[in-house]
């Protein structure tokens, strides 16, 4: 599991829209390391079922910002294994101009409890000339986060099983957690680490 971090000051200075963009293109990852205690929940104060948000995607290199595509995020109430849950779908599409350099068509699906605890994640990614499918199932037992993941690339599937004493998130559920935080008490230079 990779540990991703970003300075909270950057998240405060960048509007939520820009934070989302940076998270999606891998420029910024936020997080916190915490005890699982059989759950990794947060209070949802940032979104509700039926929400649909469009984002512009930008490439950032030093002082250069270039629009490279669009992203669409939808939020819906659902059930997962007969329990109430949220389903988040994110579709990222590069523009025709950027397709010349690097084609990007990503579809991400995340299912969480109503308290934003990750349950399932899938990413189908056409990036450049390759297509990958990543799937992750999360469960919680004996104070541990159990993560069963698999990646399919070029017809070959690799599977991995981890049991972690900390909360583990996927790239979409961590965004949802970050959107629910109140950064007003954070100080410059403070870092919050998340296991992903």
Stretches found by the model and what they are:
Residues 36-107, 124-131:
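N-terminal cleavable signal peptides for secretion/export
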Residues 6, 13-14, 30, 35:
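Glycine-centered signal
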Residues 48-50, 131-196:
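Solvent-exposed helix/loop surface patches that form functional interfaces
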Residues 56-58, 76-78, 91-93, 113, ...:
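A structural detector for beta-sheet-dominated domains
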Residues 1, 8-22:
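Bacterial N-terminal signal peptides that target proteins for export
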